[in-house]
Every structure is written in structure tokens, then in C-alpha cells.
């Protein structure tokens, strides 16, 4: 990654100097097909014309380009020597005129890491598929540009592609001619027929949201129509794309249903017509992210096309992502942050709007439960790491930006906005959004621009709110204090607010406090509720004085604010015995989340949390909450349980999961969820034999359909425990000879309990760049099996020896995958903590982004050790 960075100061200096009028980009991707020549990276031709102005004639600047070679550069008609002006990442531009035209002819490399123009060869049929992914700064891998969000411009794309391909971009395109000419690119040499696709000019947009998708994609079309109050009609062509091999699984009608519901919702609430013409959505292979909001051409990871039976939680997650990306058309694409400091201006809003519209426009009316249970768990974890930061972050450069697509920017920011809606009111919030769009359309903004419109519409001082919620880090804890009078009623109920020592800010919270009692039939139901503004260290909720004594007090009932919920002794005792009796699903989700935070904070023994899951998860009606409980229970056992209790706890989890699997309604999504969890927990010989029997048909559980995806889920534990060998996995790949099948097989192969297997997997990921991003991810996932701690122990020193080299030599995406994924978290001992500290002490000059990843992993390890100590103490006292 050397030489590829761009600092905020450099970007500000360039933005003050230049303004861009237009881009014309011509790509020739006919070289994507054909055999590799083996002579260097496979490349494509990229010719870019940029027209721009300079307000200081005679000044110097630079354009961005990451390419193996540059053929020609001309500036204002003057030919420049590429060897003199191009250094591998920048093109020097000297003696600029007031009006300038830059033309760059380059050979750019196809990507195998999901950064830039990614090339994928489908193992099922040999077809080649291309797509681009840029955020935050990888469009410079495809064409020369000024790679920063505040130098917006209209774009015209022209693409030469193989004759039988279709090409898509941000604008409407058409095939205008056939061509047959020599290909100068490396990779697919000779002459090749093709078609030229030309696309309509875009509105002014940032470089990182331009997009090209090309290949023999399967396409389904539809349309959306809207008539506004003034009689104007808006028609939006809709498209949905996937690989041909996935067409039989593609439920495009559901994608279009959610898309139309979202467009209706946002038009109703934003009062600004969708501004980018068409709306295509491509589900693409080997995608690093969930999705990307390229205007008119949204890209998604193809795992959102389901090859087998999934739960409604998966459909809800897909709908949420569709709506999240759609919200970006306004928050992020129409109005864009000036620099990555204000990334939250788009991501927090899109995350909030995804759930807001999900609940308001689709069949997934319990979306706020998922938000409280899953999204906020991500935020709470991120906000307690040493790398936590304010929602408005200090982003010094592009490496900082890459790492700040995190739980703070997304989920905490969205939680803060949910709190803001409670603070200023929904009407004022949405009116502020409408003014924001109209005032800053096709422009760039900072935090102050948003605060200005919210002050106008709410009449409140947003400065103080922003200082507390957007410009400080950390999460507060809220705990109820209940004093009962002689008559057994509440004499005083107060909410106590605490902050971490490192971030002592006490914030204003709008909260609901709920009181719950057990009914005669054992249900735990709310009988009183009061909303109040919490400020300072202690706030008395006077409205609840005189109420009957509660069995449970739930601060932040209805999930209005962002905080860690704590319990008084009575409430915690009630939950230990009666959590399953909570009738309200959101209240249950909030209590489960709070109990998980207590476990992570070493305030609740891991064995107690596992016990609660075993006792009450079978009664959980919300499938998304149930699947989250499964993940938390596994994490509690693997990371937070005392080592001496792991075997006992693991056996209990497997037995409990199997019992629930057998009791679940045949064919239900709960049965499917318990089947997957049982596979995760299985380790005893009898459990592994059952999985094997379910695969070969000698065992059967009524209603459980063991489809291909479930087969792979069963095969991984069989491989990890030495039951499924290479021959078995090869036979399964022959049965499922697809891109998905290959990823599953690679993961299972790396999971096998052999020193030679681990050495081979390590070499493929750490010492070689032969694998694509998706196969790197699969190999890492298979490598680290919780049942193989001793086998993996030798890789602790090798990890610390390798990571700086990997970070320097590989792309930032692969570097992040390796540094995060191979950290020796399973070697959870003080010695590993010391080794981590030793590396940090010896590498104070390492890249800040790399140090951040190691510091985060260290914090997770230290937290795990504290949790294990808490759990061990509980075991000792119980003994």
C-alpha cells in the first residue's frame, strides 16, 4: 500500500485550487475473456479526459491513478512523459491554466480483491463477470481522476466489451456499434469482436460512486411510476441482475416489491423526486461489502440471493440493505460529505432510514427489534474499543477512512439519530431533511450544514446536542434505583447515569422507563411507563412515584436512546427466572442485549448467560433475536467461559440445541435455526454421527430439509473434527460445482485438524496472493476452529512476524482481512496479551491503521480474559 494514501490536508488544498467540469471515461474490457498470458497482471485500457478549472493559473496539482502502466498523458494539448509525471499512484500536473483538459491513456489491472474493477470467472460455466467497487478511493484503479468526494462532476462512460455481453453504468446506456480491433492489453491478446456501450451523462457525482457492471448477467426488468400532487409523472426503469448460475434462485419479484415500497416511502417523506433516472440493482460475486449505493446502479453481495431455505430474518436483512442503499440516493449521492470526517452524514442516516422505512413501508414491521438487538450490539462493541471515536470522526487520510466504516459510523450514528427524532420530533426531523436536500443538492456538506436546518425546523439549539452526541466518544450506562415505601409502593425511582473513565461525558437522554410485574399466569407484563429527560448523574422519575412495586424496571424501554441498560438486583433476579415470560418482543430483545453486555463486561458469568439461553431461547418467537442468541451463546462459550468449563458448557449447548431441534415445528424457520446452531455446537461423537447421518440419509428429523446450504453447514464441523476428509469434500464440490460450493469447500478444507492443512492454509493467505478475496475470506474462516486451540498455537509468533509485511505488500482490504482474521484470539492467555503488547511497543512507527487493528484485537483479548476470570470465580463459588 505504499504511495497510495491521500491525506485530508492534501484533499483540502486540491479542492481549494480546482473545480471539475466533466469526465469522459472510455474503458476496453474485451481483455477480460480468454486465457491468461502469464505475462504480468491482466489489464484493460482506460482513457480518461478530465476538464477542470484552476483558480490560480500557473499552480501545480496532481491527479490520482493506480495502474501498472501509463501509455500517454497530455495536459492542455501538451504531451507529457509518463515516466516523468507518473509515480505509480499520482500524475503530476504543473503550470495549470485557468481552464484545463487532461487526457490519460493507461493500462489498468483487473482486481481479484474486490477493489477497483473486479474480475470473476464462474467455475460452473467459465463465464466472466465484471463489476466495480470504489469506496472510499478505488476508482483510481480504473480511471484517472481527482479521488476525493468534494470534487464532483458529471461523468460520461463508454465501454468496449465482448460481443455477447451487456454493460451497465450509472446512466442509461445503449450499444451503439460493433468493433473489431487489436487489443493492446495484457491477458486476452489478439483481436476480438466487441460492442461499444455509451452511457448518458450523469448528474454531478463523486468519483467513488461511479460504477460499471459488465458480463453475461441475467437481468429482470420492471418499472416504477409516481404521480406527484402537482400532476408531474416520474417513471423509473428498474433492473435486477445476477449471474446466470444463480438465475434459478433469484426472487427478483421480492426485490422489486421492496424497491417500490421504498421509493414510495422516501418520496412521501423526502419531498424530493428520485434524481438519478433509472434504478438497477446488481447482485455480484466475491463482494467485500453488503452493498454499495452507486446512483442508478446499486451493487449487492450475491449472498442476498438465497440458494436454499433461510429464515425470515434473512429476507428482512436483505430488505433493510435495499432500503439502506436507496436512502443513500438522497443522503450521500445527492448530498455528499465534503471529506470522510463526516462519513456519518450518509451512513448514519442510511442506517437509520433503513430501519425506519423497513418498519413503515414493508412487511417487516418488527425491524426496530432487529435494530435494537443486532445493529446496536455492533455499536456497543465498537464504542468500547480503544479505537472508538466520535460519530464525527477525525479522518486524517484514506487508511483512516477505510477503517471507519464501523459500528460507530453506522449503528451508533443511527442510534443517535433515533434519539434525535425523539428529541426534536419526527416532523421537525423530516422537514430538516427536506430542506437539507433542496439546499445542498449535488453539493457537499459538513456537520454544520445539517445542524443549521435542524435548528430551523425544531427551534432547538443543536450545538449542545451535537457536542454531547456527535463530538464525544463512549457509551453511557443507565441503572434504575428503586426505593420502596412502607406501603410497598415506589417512594422514589431514579435513573443513575455512568460513563467510562476514558470518556467521562454524561449526556442528555430521552428515555422511557417501563415497570413490569408477573401476572397470575406467569407472564411478565408492563403496567406503567414514563418518558423523561435524563441529565447528569442522577435523575428522579417523579411520574412513577406511588406505583406498585415492580418485578422488573427497564430503563430505555422502547429503545429511544443509545445506552447500556443495567438492572437493579430485583430486576436481574426476575430475569434469571422469568425472562421467557416477557410478552413484549422488543422488551425481551432489550433485556437479552443488556444481559449480553453484562457478560462482555465481566459482570455476568458466561456460564450464566449460556444457561439463560438454554432455558429461554426455545420460547423466543422473533427469529432474528433467536439467531442472535445462538451467536452470542457460542461467543460466550468460546471467548468468555473459563477454560475448565468449556467442555461442560459445550456439551450442554449441543444437547440443548438438539432437544430444541427435535421439538421445533417440522419445516419451520425455528427448526432451521436450531439445526444450524446444533451443527455449530456439535463435537461429541454421537452428535457428529447424527450430522453424518442427516447428510447420507440414514438419519432424519421430521420436516428438516437438508438442502445444499445446510449440507455445507453440517460438513464444516465434520471436517473440523476429522470426520469429513478431502475425498468427502471433493465429492460434495462435485455435487455443488458452483462458486458458492467452491467457497464452502475451501472453508471446510482449511478447517481440517491437521498441521499440514493449517500450514497450507496459512501459506495461501499470508505468503501468496493467488487467492481471490472471497477465497481468502473462506480460508481464514476455516482456519480458526475453536476446537483446535493447541494445533493453532504455533501461529501466534508467526502472526506477529508477518502482519507488517502483509500490510505493506497487499491491498488494504486483504490486509484488513488477514490482520483481523488471523489474530490469535483462540490463544486466550496472558502470554498472548504480552506478545501483542510487545509487538505494539516494537512497532510504534507502523501504519496507524495497522496499529489500530492490533489494538482492537488486543482489547477483545483482554476483555475475554476478564470474562473468563469472572466465569471461573462463579464456578469456584458454586463449587
Descriptions of predicted regions:
Residues 49-67, 156-162, 448, 493-514:
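Surface-exposed beta-strand/loop patches in extracellular or lumenal glycoproteins
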Residues 487-492, 503-506, 521-525, 542-879:
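Long, ordered, helix-rich scaffold segments
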Residues 107-225, 394, 584-593:
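Extended, low-hydrophobicity, Ser/Thr/Pro/Gly-biased non-transmembrane segments
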Residues 60, 79-97, 133, 137-140, ...:
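Aromatic/His-enriched, Gly/Pro-containing loop or helix-boundary segments
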Residues 55, 61, 65-124, 147, ...:
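A surface-exposed beta-strand-loop module
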Residues 69-76, 462-463, 475-556:
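Beta-strand-rich binding/interaction modules
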Amino acid at each position: 500500500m505504499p504511495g497510495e494514501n491521500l491525506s485530508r490536508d492534501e484533499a483540502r488544498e486540491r479542492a481549494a485550487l480546482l473545480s471539475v467540469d466533466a469526465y469522459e471515461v472510455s474503458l476496453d474490457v474485451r481483455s477480460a475473456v480468454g486465457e491468461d498470458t502469464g505475462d504480468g497482471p491482466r489489464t484493460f485500457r482506460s482513457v480518461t479526459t478530465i476538464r477542470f478549472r484552476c483558480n490560480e493559473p500557473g499552480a501545480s496539482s496532481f491527479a490520482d491513478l493506480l495502474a501498472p502502466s501509463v501509455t500517454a498523458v497530455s495536459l492542455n494539448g501538451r504531451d507529457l512523459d509518463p515516466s516523468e509525471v507518473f509515480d505509480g499512484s499520482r500524475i503530476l500536473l504543473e503550470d495549470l491554466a485557468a481552464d484545463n483538459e487532461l487526457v490519460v491513456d493507461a493500462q489498468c489491472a483487473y482486481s481479484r480483491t474486490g477493489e477497483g474493477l473486479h474480475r470473476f470467472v464462474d467455475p460452473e460455466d467459465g463465464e466472466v463477470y465484471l463489476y466495480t467497487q470504489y469506496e472510499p478511493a478505488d476508482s483510481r484503479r480504473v480511471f484517472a481522476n481527482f479521488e476525493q468526494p468534494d470534487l464532483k462532476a458529471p461523468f460520461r462512460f463508454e465501454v468496449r466489451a465482448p460481443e455477447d455481453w451487456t454493460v451497465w453504468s450509472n446512466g442509461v446506456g445503449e450499444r451503439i456499434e460493433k468493433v473489431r480491433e487489436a487489443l493492446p492489453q495484457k491477458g486476452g491478446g489478439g483481436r476480438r469482436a466487441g460492442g461499444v456501450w455509451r452511457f448518458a451523462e450523469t448528474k454531478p457525482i463523486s468519483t467513488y460512486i461511479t460504477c460499471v457492471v459488465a458480463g453475461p448477467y441475467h437481468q429482470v426488468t420492471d418499472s416504477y411510476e409516481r404521480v406527484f400532487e402537482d400532476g408531474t409523472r416520474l417513471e423509473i426503469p428498474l433492473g435486477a441482475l445476477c449471474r446466470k448460475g444463480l438465475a434459478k434462485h433469484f426472487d427478483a419479484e421480492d426485490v422489486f416489491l421492496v424497491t417500490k415500497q421504498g421509493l414510495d416511502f422516501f418520496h412521501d417523506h423526502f419531498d424530493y423526486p428520485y434524481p438519478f433516472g433509472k434504478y438497477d440493482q446488481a447482485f455480484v460475486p466475491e463482494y467485500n461489502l453488503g452493498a454499495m449505493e452507486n446512483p442508478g446502479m446499486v451493487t449487492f453481495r450475491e449472498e442476498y440471493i438465497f440458494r436454499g431455505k433461510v429464515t425470515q430474518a434473512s429476507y428482512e436483512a436483505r430488505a433493510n440493505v435495499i432500503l439502506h442503499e436507496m436512502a443513500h440516493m438522497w443522503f450521500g449521492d445527492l448530498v455528499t460529505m465534503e471529506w470522510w470526517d463526516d462519513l456519518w452524514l450518509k451512513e448514519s442516516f442510511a442506517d437509520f432510514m433503513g430501519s425506519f422505512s423497513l418498519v413503515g413501508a414493508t412487511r417487516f414491521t418488527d425491524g426496530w427489534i432487529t435494530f435494537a438487538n443486532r445493529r446496536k450490539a455492533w455499536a456497543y462493541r465498537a464504542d468500547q474499543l480503544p479505537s472508538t471515536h466520535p460519530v464525527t470522526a477525525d479522518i486524517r487520510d484514506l487508511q483512516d477512512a477505510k477503517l471507519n466504516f464501523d459500528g460507530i459510523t453506522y449503528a451508533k450514528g443511527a442510534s443517535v439519530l433515533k434519539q434525535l427524532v425523539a428529541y426534536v420530533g419526527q416532523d421537525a426531523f423530516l422537514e430538516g431533511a427536506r430542506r437539507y436536500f433542496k439546499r445542498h443538492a449535488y453539493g457537499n456538506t459538513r456537520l454544520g450544514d445539517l445542524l443549521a436546518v435542524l435548528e430551523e425546523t425544531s427551534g432547538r439549539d443543536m450545538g449542545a446536542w451535537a457536542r454531547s452526541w456527535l463530538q464525544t466518544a463512549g457509551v453511557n450506562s443507565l441503572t434504575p434505583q428503586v426505593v420502596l415505601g412502607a406501603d410497598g409502593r415506589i417512594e422514589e425511582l431514579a435513573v443513575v447515569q455512568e460513563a467510562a473513565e476514558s470518556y467521562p461525558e454524561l449526556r442528555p437522554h430521552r428515555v422511557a422507563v417501563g415497570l413490569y410485574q408477573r401476572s397470575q399466569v406467569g407472564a411478565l407484563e408492563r403496567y406503567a411507563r414514563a418518558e423523561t429527560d435524563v441529565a447528569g448523574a442522577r435523575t428522579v422519575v417523579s411520574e412513577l412515584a406511588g406505583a406498585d412495586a415492580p418485578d422488573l424496571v427497564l430503563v430505555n424501554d422502547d429503545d429511544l436512546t443509545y445506552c447500556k441498560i443495567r438492572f437493579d438486583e430485583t430486576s436481574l433476579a426476575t430475569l434469571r427466572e422469568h425472562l421467557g415470560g416477557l410478552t413484549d418482543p422488543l422488551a425481551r430483545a432489550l433485556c437479552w442485549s443488556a444481559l449480553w453486555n453484562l457478560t462482555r463486561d465481566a459482570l455476568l458469568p458466561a456460564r450464566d448467560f449460556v444457561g439463560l439461553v438454554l432455558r429461554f431461547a426455545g420460547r423466543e418467537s422473533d427469529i432474528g433475536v433467536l439467531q442472535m442468541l445462538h451467536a452470542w451463546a457460542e461467543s460466550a462459550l468460546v471467548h468468555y467461559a473459563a477454560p475448565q468449563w468449556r467442555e461442560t458448557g459445550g456439551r450442554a449447548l449441543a444437547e440443548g440445541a438438539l432437544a430444541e431441534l427435535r421439538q421445533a415445528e417440522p419445516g419451520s424457520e425455528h427448526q432451521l435455526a436450531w439445526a444450524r446452531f446444533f451443527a455449530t455446537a456439535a463435537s461429541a461423537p454421537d452428535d457428529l454421527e447424527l450430522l453424518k447421518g442427516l447428510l447420507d440419509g440414514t438419519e432424519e428429523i421430521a420436516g428438516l430439509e437438508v438442502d445444499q446450504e445446510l449440507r455445507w453447514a453440517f460438513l464444516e464441523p465434520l471436517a473440523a473434527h476429522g470426520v469429513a476428509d478431502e475425498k468427502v469434500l471433493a465429492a460434495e464440490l462435485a455435487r455443488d460445482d458452483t462458486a458458492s460450493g467452491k467457497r464452502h469447500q475451501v472453508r471446510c478444507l482449511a478447517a481440517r485438524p491437521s498441521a499440514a492443512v493449517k500450514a497450507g492454509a496459512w501459506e495461501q493467505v499470508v505468503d501468496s496472493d493467488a487467492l481471490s478475496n472471497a477465497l481468502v475470506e473462506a480460508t481464514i474462516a476455516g482456519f480458526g476452529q475453536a476446537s483446535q486451540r493447541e494445533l493453532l498455537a504455533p501461529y501466534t509468533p508467526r502472526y506477529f512476524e508477518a502482519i507488517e509485511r502483509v500490510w505493506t505488500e497487499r491491498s488494504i482490504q486483504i490486509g484488513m482481512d488477514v490482520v483481523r482474521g488471523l489474530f490469535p484470539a483462540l490463544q486466550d492467555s496472558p502470554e498472548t496479551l504480552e506478545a501483542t503488547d510487545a509487538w505494539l511497543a516494537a512497532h510504534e512507527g507502523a501504519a496507524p491503521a495497522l496499529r489500530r487493528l492490533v489494538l482492537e484485537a488486543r482489547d477483545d483479548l483482554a476483555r475475554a480474559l476478564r470474562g473468563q476470570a469472572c466465569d471461573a470465580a462463579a464456578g469456584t463459588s458454586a463449587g
